[in-house]
Protein backbone atom coordinates (compact mmCIF):
# COMPACT_ATOMS: atom_id res chain seq x y z
CA UNK A 1 0.00 0.00 0.00
CA UNK A 2 1.59 3.26 -1.13
CA UNK A 3 1.07 6.75 0.27
CA UNK A 4 -2.61 7.77 0.05
CA UNK A 5 -3.67 11.43 -0.12
CA UNK A 6 -6.71 11.78 2.12
CA UNK A 7 -6.48 15.56 1.61
CA UNK A 8 -3.73 17.93 0.55
CA UNK A 9 -2.36 17.91 4.10
CA UNK A 10 -3.40 14.52 5.48
CA UNK A 11 -1.72 11.42 4.07
CA UNK A 12 -2.13 7.73 4.79
CA UNK A 13 1.17 5.89 5.15
CA UNK A 14 -0.13 2.53 6.31
CA UNK A 15 0.78 -0.91 5.03
CA UNK A 16 -1.23 -3.88 3.79
CA UNK A 17 -0.15 -7.21 5.26
CA UNK A 18 -1.21 -9.88 2.79
CA UNK A 19 1.00 -12.68 4.12
CA UNK A 20 -0.47 -12.85 7.63
CA UNK A 21 -2.82 -15.79 8.18
CA UNK A 22 -4.00 -15.19 11.76
CA UNK A 23 -4.64 -11.75 13.22
CA UNK A 24 -3.85 -11.64 16.95
CA UNK A 25 -2.68 -15.24 16.45
CA UNK A 26 -6.27 -16.48 16.31
CA UNK A 27 -8.53 -14.78 13.72
CA UNK A 28 -8.22 -15.95 10.09
CA UNK A 29 -7.70 -13.06 7.68
CA UNK A 30 -7.88 -14.60 4.19
CA UNK A 31 -7.59 -11.18 2.54
CA UNK A 32 -4.96 -9.89 4.95
CA UNK A 33 -5.14 -6.82 7.18
CA UNK A 34 -3.94 -3.24 7.01
CA UNK A 35 -1.98 -1.37 9.65
CA UNK A 36 -2.90 2.28 9.15
CA UNK A 37 -0.77 5.28 10.04
CA UNK A 38 -1.26 8.91 9.09
CA UNK A 39 0.74 12.09 8.55
CA UNK A 40 -0.53 15.67 8.87
CA UNK A 41 1.77 18.06 7.03
CA UNK A 42 1.60 21.47 8.70
CA UNK A 43 3.82 23.92 10.56
CA UNK A 44 4.23 21.14 13.10
CA UNK A 45 4.18 17.98 11.01
CA UNK A 46 2.59 15.14 12.93
CA UNK A 47 2.51 11.35 12.64
CA UNK A 48 -0.47 9.45 14.00
CA UNK A 49 0.50 5.94 15.13
CA UNK A 50 3.06 3.46 13.88
CA UNK A 51 2.52 -0.08 12.56
CA UNK A 52 3.13 -3.73 13.35
CA UNK A 53 6.71 -5.03 13.30
CA UNK A 54 5.79 -7.14 10.27
CA UNK A 55 5.40 -3.95 8.22
CA UNK A 56 8.24 -1.77 9.51
CA UNK A 57 10.34 -1.35 6.38
CA UNK A 58 7.49 -0.61 4.00
CA UNK A 59 5.99 1.81 6.51
CA UNK A 60 9.26 3.69 6.93
CA UNK A 61 9.52 4.01 3.15
CA UNK A 62 5.97 5.38 2.97
CA UNK A 63 6.69 7.71 5.86
CA UNK A 64 9.84 9.07 4.23
CA UNK A 65 7.90 9.77 1.04
CA UNK A 66 5.07 11.51 2.91
CA UNK A 67 7.39 13.63 5.06
CA UNK A 68 9.29 14.73 1.93
CA UNK A 69 12.22 16.09 3.90
CA UNK A 70 10.20 17.39 6.84
CA UNK A 71 11.07 16.43 10.39
CA UNK A 72 8.06 15.39 12.46
CA UNK A 73 7.26 17.52 15.48
CA UNK A 74 4.89 15.02 17.10
CA UNK A 75 3.95 11.34 17.17
CA UNK A 76 0.40 10.83 18.41
CA UNK A 77 -0.09 7.42 20.06
CA UNK A 78 -3.76 6.47 19.89
CA UNK A 79 -3.30 2.88 20.96
CA UNK A 80 -0.34 0.96 22.41
CA UNK A 81 -1.26 -2.51 21.14
CA UNK A 82 1.75 -3.89 19.24
CA UNK A 83 0.07 -3.92 15.83
CA UNK A 84 0.08 -0.12 16.12
CA UNK A 85 2.78 0.68 18.65
CA UNK A 86 5.59 -1.68 17.67
CA UNK A 87 7.69 1.03 16.03
CA UNK A 88 7.41 3.79 18.62
CA UNK A 89 10.92 3.29 20.00
CA UNK A 90 12.41 2.99 16.50
CA UNK A 91 10.71 6.19 15.35
CA UNK A 92 11.77 8.04 18.50
CA UNK A 93 15.38 7.04 17.80
CA UNK A 94 15.16 8.11 14.14
CA UNK A 95 13.83 11.56 15.09
CA UNK A 96 15.41 12.49 18.43
CA UNK A 97 13.74 15.92 18.54
CA UNK A 98 10.24 14.55 17.95
CA UNK A 99 7.85 14.67 20.90
CA UNK A 100 5.50 11.80 21.69
CA UNK A 101 1.89 12.58 22.61
CA UNK A 102 -0.24 10.28 24.74
CA UNK A 103 -2.09 10.07 28.03
CA UNK A 104 -0.86 8.82 31.38
CA UNK A 105 -1.79 5.20 30.61
CA UNK A 106 -0.14 5.45 27.19
CA UNK A 107 3.21 6.17 28.77
CA UNK A 108 2.73 3.53 31.46
CA UNK A 109 2.30 0.87 28.77
CA UNK A 110 5.04 2.38 26.63
CA UNK A 111 7.49 1.94 29.50
CA UNK A 112 6.33 -1.66 29.93
CA UNK A 113 6.90 -2.46 26.25
CA UNK A 114 10.10 -0.52 25.60
CA UNK A 115 11.51 0.61 28.95
CA UNK A 116 11.52 4.22 30.18
CA UNK A 117 14.66 5.09 28.24
CA UNK A 118 12.99 4.66 24.82
CA UNK A 119 11.20 8.01 25.10
CA UNK A 120 12.80 10.41 27.58
CA UNK A 121 10.54 12.26 30.02
CA UNK A 122 11.24 15.63 28.41
CA UNK A 123 9.98 14.32 25.06
CA UNK A 124 6.60 13.27 26.41
CA UNK A 125 3.47 15.39 26.03
CA UNK A 126 0.82 14.03 28.38
CA UNK A 127 -2.69 15.12 27.41
CA UNK A 128 -6.02 14.93 29.18
CA UNK A 129 -9.46 14.18 27.80
CA UNK A 130 -10.70 17.10 25.71
CA UNK A 131 -7.36 18.88 25.41
CA UNK A 132 -6.20 20.17 22.03
CA UNK A 133 -2.89 20.46 20.21
CA UNK A 134 -2.34 23.15 17.59
CA UNK A 135 -0.28 22.10 14.58
CA UNK A 136 -0.61 25.34 12.60
CA UNK A 137 -3.67 25.35 10.37
CA UNK A 138 -4.81 22.05 11.90
CA UNK A 139 -5.84 21.36 15.50
CA UNK A 140 -6.20 17.95 17.09
CA UNK A 141 -8.59 17.45 20.01
CA UNK A 142 -8.09 14.28 22.02
CA UNK A 143 -11.14 12.28 23.07
CA UNK A 144 -10.47 9.46 25.49
CA UNK A 145 -12.04 6.11 24.62
CA UNK A 146 -11.06 3.79 27.49
CA UNK A 147 -11.67 0.08 26.83
CA UNK A 148 -12.35 0.56 23.13
CA UNK A 149 -10.66 -1.83 23.47
CA UNK A 150 -7.65 -1.09 25.74
CA UNK A 151 -7.59 1.28 28.74
CA UNK A 152 -5.30 3.90 27.14
CA UNK A 153 -7.13 4.32 23.83
CA UNK A 154 -7.87 7.83 22.64
CA UNK A 155 -9.18 9.14 19.35
CA UNK A 156 -8.21 12.45 17.76
CA UNK A 157 -10.53 14.94 16.05
CA UNK A 158 -9.09 17.39 13.53
CA UNK A 159 -11.51 20.31 13.37
CA UNK A 160 -10.50 22.16 10.18
CA UNK A 161 -11.01 19.14 7.92
CA UNK A 162 -13.51 17.42 10.22
CA UNK A 163 -11.53 14.18 10.41
CA UNK A 164 -11.84 11.62 13.21
CA UNK A 165 -8.78 9.44 13.72
CA UNK A 166 -10.70 6.63 15.37
CA UNK A 167 -8.01 4.20 16.62
CA UNK A 168 -9.39 0.63 16.36
CA UNK A 169 -12.94 1.96 16.09
CA UNK A 170 -14.49 1.43 12.64
CA UNK A 171 -11.70 -0.96 11.74
CA UNK A 172 -12.07 -3.86 9.34
CA UNK A 173 -10.24 -7.04 8.44
CA UNK A 174 -8.84 -7.13 4.92
CA UNK A 175 -6.08 -5.39 2.99
CA UNK A 176 -7.13 -1.93 1.85
CA UNK A 177 -5.84 -2.51 -1.69
CA UNK A 178 -8.20 -5.49 -1.98
CA UNK A 179 -11.25 -3.58 -0.71
CA UNK A 180 -13.85 -2.85 -3.35
CA UNK A 181 -15.65 0.42 -2.55
CA UNK A 182 -18.86 -1.17 -3.84
CA UNK A 183 -18.40 -4.27 -1.70
CA UNK A 184 -19.98 -4.94 1.67
CA UNK A 185 -17.89 -2.99 4.19
CA UNK A 186 -19.92 -4.47 7.03
CA UNK A 187 -19.02 -8.13 6.47
CA UNK A 188 -15.45 -8.02 7.76
CA UNK A 189 -16.04 -4.90 9.88
CA UNK A 190 -18.69 -6.87 11.74
CA UNK A 191 -16.37 -9.83 12.33
CA UNK A 192 -13.60 -7.46 13.40
CA UNK A 193 -15.83 -5.53 15.81
CA UNK A 194 -17.60 -8.47 17.42
CA UNK A 195 -14.43 -10.49 17.99
CA UNK A 196 -12.04 -7.66 18.90
CA UNK A 197 -14.21 -5.01 20.55
CA UNK A 198 -17.50 -6.83 21.14
CA UNK A 199 -17.09 -7.26 24.89
CA UNK A 200 -17.03 -3.50 25.42
CA UNK A 201 -20.43 -2.36 24.19
CA UNK A 202 -21.06 0.19 26.99
CA UNK A 203 -17.68 1.80 26.36
CA UNK A 204 -18.38 2.02 22.62
CA UNK A 205 -21.73 3.60 23.40
CA UNK A 206 -19.95 6.21 25.52
CA UNK A 207 -17.60 7.00 22.64
CA UNK A 208 -20.49 7.26 20.17
CA UNK A 209 -22.13 9.84 22.44
CA UNK A 210 -18.93 11.88 22.43
CA UNK A 211 -18.63 11.52 18.65
CA UNK A 212 -22.21 12.74 18.19
CA UNK A 213 -21.09 16.18 19.37
CA UNK A 214 -18.48 16.39 16.58
CA UNK A 215 -19.00 17.37 12.95
CA UNK A 216 -17.29 14.41 11.26
CA UNK A 217 -16.79 14.18 7.49
CA UNK A 218 -14.06 11.51 7.37
CA UNK A 219 -13.15 8.59 9.64
CA UNK A 220 -9.55 7.34 9.58
CA UNK A 221 -9.32 3.99 11.45
CA UNK A 222 -6.20 2.00 12.27
CA UNK A 223 -7.41 -0.97 10.19
CA UNK A 224 -9.32 -0.96 6.93
CA UNK A 225 -10.39 1.75 4.50
CA UNK A 226 -10.80 5.45 5.25
CA UNK A 227 -14.54 6.14 5.50
CA UNK A 228 -16.19 9.08 3.73
CA UNK A 229 -19.59 9.93 2.30
CA UNK A 230 -22.61 8.76 4.26
CA UNK A 231 -21.05 8.08 7.66
CA UNK A 232 -24.46 7.47 9.20
CA UNK A 233 -24.54 3.85 8.03
CA UNK A 234 -21.23 3.11 9.78
CA UNK A 235 -22.35 4.85 12.95
CA UNK A 236 -25.65 2.97 12.86
CA UNK A 237 -23.85 -0.36 12.62
CA UNK A 238 -21.70 0.53 15.62
CA UNK A 239 -24.72 1.66 17.60
CA UNK A 240 -26.50 -1.64 16.86
CA UNK A 241 -23.50 -3.86 17.56
CA UNK A 242 -22.57 -2.08 20.80
CA UNK A 243 -26.19 -2.21 21.99
CA UNK A 244 -26.18 -6.02 21.50
CA UNK A 245 -29.17 -5.80 19.18
CA UNK A 246 -29.48 -8.44 16.44
CA UNK A 247 -29.28 -7.12 12.90
CA UNK A 248 -31.78 -9.75 11.76
CA UNK A 249 -34.05 -10.54 14.72
CA UNK A 250 -35.93 -13.36 12.96
CA UNK A 251 -32.92 -15.02 11.35
CA UNK A 252 -31.85 -18.33 12.95
CA UNK A 253 -28.32 -19.68 13.20
CA UNK A 254 -28.13 -23.48 13.47
CA UNK A 255 -24.65 -24.28 14.77
CA UNK A 256 -23.62 -27.92 15.17
CA UNK A 257 -20.67 -29.67 16.79
CA UNK A 258 -20.77 -33.26 15.59
CA UNK A 259 -18.24 -36.06 16.11
CA UNK A 260 -19.29 -38.60 13.47
CA UNK A 261 -21.91 -36.61 11.58
CA UNK A 262 -25.17 -37.69 13.24
CA UNK A 263 -25.60 -34.44 15.19
CA UNK A 264 -24.80 -32.39 12.08
CA UNK A 265 -27.36 -34.40 10.12
CA UNK A 266 -29.97 -33.81 12.82
CA UNK A 267 -29.18 -30.09 12.85
CA UNK A 268 -29.75 -29.96 9.10
CA UNK A 269 -33.11 -31.72 9.46
CA UNK A 270 -34.14 -29.09 12.01
CA UNK A 271 -32.91 -26.31 9.73
CA UNK A 272 -35.09 -27.64 6.92
CA UNK A 273 -38.10 -27.78 9.23
CA UNK A 274 -37.47 -24.14 10.15
CA UNK A 275 -37.19 -23.15 6.49
CA UNK A 276 -40.45 -24.95 5.78
CA UNK A 277 -42.06 -22.62 8.31
CA UNK A 278 -40.69 -19.59 6.47
CA UNK A 279 -37.69 -18.88 8.68
CA UNK A 280 -34.43 -17.52 7.30
CA UNK A 281 -31.74 -19.98 8.44
CA UNK A 282 -27.96 -20.17 8.24
CA UNK A 283 -26.19 -23.44 9.09
CA UNK A 284 -22.67 -23.68 10.47
CA UNK A 285 -20.58 -26.77 11.12
CA UNK A 286 -18.38 -25.74 14.04
CA UNK A 287 -15.87 -28.47 13.26
CA UNK A 288 -15.20 -26.86 9.87
CA UNK A 289 -15.80 -23.17 10.59
CA UNK A 290 -13.51 -20.89 12.55
CA UNK A 291 -15.19 -19.77 15.75
CA UNK A 292 -14.86 -16.07 14.83
CA UNK A 293 -17.34 -16.55 11.98
CA UNK A 294 -19.77 -18.40 14.26
CA UNK A 295 -19.53 -15.67 16.91
CA UNK A 296 -20.26 -13.08 14.24
CA UNK A 297 -23.30 -14.93 12.92
CA UNK A 298 -24.66 -15.56 16.42
CA UNK A 299 -24.56 -11.82 17.13
CA UNK A 300 -26.11 -11.04 13.76
CA UNK A 301 -29.07 -13.39 14.25
CA UNK A 302 -31.83 -12.95 16.78
CA UNK A 303 -32.11 -16.69 17.37
CA UNK A 304 -29.64 -19.56 17.57
CA UNK A 305 -29.86 -23.35 17.77
CA UNK A 306 -26.92 -25.07 19.43
CA UNK A 307 -26.63 -28.74 18.45
CA UNK A 308 -23.89 -30.63 20.26
CA UNK A 309 -22.70 -34.15 20.88
CA UNK A 310 -21.75 -35.19 24.39
CA UNK A 311 -18.02 -35.90 24.62
CA UNK A 312 -16.48 -37.63 27.65
CA UNK A 313 -19.31 -36.29 29.77
CA UNK A 314 -18.70 -32.73 28.56
CA UNK A 315 -19.39 -30.67 25.45
CA UNK A 316 -17.68 -31.55 22.20
CA UNK A 317 -14.82 -28.97 22.14
CA UNK A 318 -15.93 -26.90 19.11
CA UNK A 319 -19.20 -26.07 20.88
CA UNK A 320 -17.39 -25.38 24.13
CA UNK A 321 -15.15 -22.95 22.23
CA UNK A 322 -18.13 -21.13 20.74
CA UNK A 323 -19.88 -20.74 24.09
CA UNK A 324 -16.68 -19.55 25.74
CA UNK A 325 -16.17 -16.92 23.04
CA UNK A 326 -19.79 -15.80 23.19
CA UNK A 327 -19.63 -15.38 26.95
CA UNK A 328 -16.33 -13.50 26.69
CA UNK A 329 -17.83 -11.13 24.11
CA UNK A 330 -20.89 -10.36 26.27
CA UNK A 331 -23.42 -12.23 24.13
CA UNK A 332 -26.92 -11.29 25.28
CA UNK A 333 -30.54 -10.54 24.35
CA UNK A 334 -31.05 -13.64 22.19
CA UNK A 335 -33.32 -16.69 21.94
CA UNK A 336 -31.62 -20.10 21.92
CA UNK A 337 -32.82 -23.63 21.19
CA UNK A 338 -30.87 -26.69 22.31
CA UNK A 339 -30.21 -30.04 20.66
CA UNK A 340 -28.06 -32.77 22.23
CA UNK A 341 -26.80 -36.17 21.20
CA UNK A 342 -25.39 -39.01 23.27
CA UNK A 343 -25.44 -42.76 22.79
CA UNK A 344 -25.62 -43.65 26.50
CA UNK A 345 -25.62 -40.45 28.57
CA UNK A 346 -26.56 -37.27 26.69
CA UNK A 347 -25.38 -34.30 28.79
CA UNK A 348 -24.86 -31.53 26.25
CA UNK A 349 -28.17 -29.70 26.70
CA UNK A 350 -27.69 -29.39 30.45
CA UNK A 351 -24.12 -28.16 30.01
CA UNK A 352 -25.04 -25.67 27.29
CA UNK A 353 -27.92 -24.39 29.41
CA UNK A 354 -25.53 -23.79 32.30
CA UNK A 355 -23.30 -21.67 30.03
CA UNK A 356 -26.25 -19.68 28.71
CA UNK A 357 -27.51 -19.03 32.24
CA UNK A 358 -24.37 -16.96 32.78
CA UNK A 359 -25.30 -14.58 29.94
CA UNK A 360 -27.65 -11.59 30.12
CA UNK A 361 -31.27 -11.59 28.98
CA UNK A 362 -31.18 -14.96 27.28
CA UNK A 363 -34.37 -16.86 26.43
CA UNK A 364 -33.87 -20.63 26.20
CA UNK A 365 -36.64 -22.57 24.48
CA UNK A 366 -38.60 -25.03 26.59
CA UNK A 367 -38.49 -27.67 23.84
CA UNK A 368 -35.19 -29.56 23.82
CA UNK A 369 -34.17 -32.15 21.24
CA UNK A 370 -32.43 -35.22 22.67
CA UNK A 371 -30.97 -37.71 20.20
CA UNK A 372 -29.64 -41.09 21.20
CA UNK A 373 -27.13 -41.91 18.48
CA UNK A 374 -29.28 -41.10 15.43
CA UNK A 375 -32.54 -39.36 14.59
CA UNK A 376 -35.71 -41.38 15.12
CA UNK A 377 -39.42 -40.58 15.24
CA UNK A 378 -39.25 -39.34 18.84
CA UNK A 379 -36.41 -36.96 18.00
CA UNK A 380 -38.30 -35.69 14.94
CA UNK A 381 -41.29 -34.90 17.12
CA UNK A 382 -39.05 -32.93 19.47
CA UNK A 383 -37.62 -31.07 16.46
CA UNK A 384 -41.12 -30.14 15.34
CA UNK A 385 -41.86 -28.75 18.79
CA UNK A 386 -38.61 -26.77 18.88
CA UNK A 387 -39.13 -25.41 15.36
CA UNK A 388 -42.63 -24.27 16.27
CA UNK A 389 -41.40 -22.57 19.43
CA UNK A 390 -38.52 -20.83 17.66
CA UNK A 391 -40.58 -19.31 14.86
CA UNK A 392 -43.13 -18.03 17.37
CA UNK A 393 -40.68 -16.54 19.90
Where are these regions (language model features)?
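Short acidic active-site motifs
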Residues: 87, 290-294
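Active-site neighborhood of phospho(di)ester-bond hydrolases with catalytic His/Asp-centered motifs
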Residues: 48-50, 72-80, 99-103, 164-168, ...
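FMN-binding flavodoxin-like domain, especially the glycine-rich phosphate-binding loop
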Residues: 176-180, 184-219, 223-226, 269-284, ...
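Metallo-beta-lactamase
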Residues: 4-8, 101-153, 200-206
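Active-site metal-binding motif and surrounding structural segment of the metallo-beta-lactamase
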Residues: 54-101
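Short N-terminal or domain-adjacent regulatory/targeting segments
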Residues: 220-248
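Conserved beta-strand hairpin/beta-sheet module of binuclear metal-dependent hydrolase folds
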Residues: 3-65, 155-158, 162-165, 263
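Short, charged N-terminal beta->alpha structural module
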Residues: 255-277
Amino acid sequence: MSVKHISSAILGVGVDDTTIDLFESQYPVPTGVSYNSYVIRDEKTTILDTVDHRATEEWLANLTEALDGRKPEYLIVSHMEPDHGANIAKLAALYPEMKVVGNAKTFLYMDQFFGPEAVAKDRRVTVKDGESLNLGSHTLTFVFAPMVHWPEVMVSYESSEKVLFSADGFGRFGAVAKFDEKADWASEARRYYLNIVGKYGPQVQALLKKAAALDIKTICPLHGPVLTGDLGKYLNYYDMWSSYKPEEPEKILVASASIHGHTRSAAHILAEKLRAKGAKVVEMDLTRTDVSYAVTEAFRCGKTVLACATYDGFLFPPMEALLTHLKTKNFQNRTVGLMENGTWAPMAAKLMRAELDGMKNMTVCDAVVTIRSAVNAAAEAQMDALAEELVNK
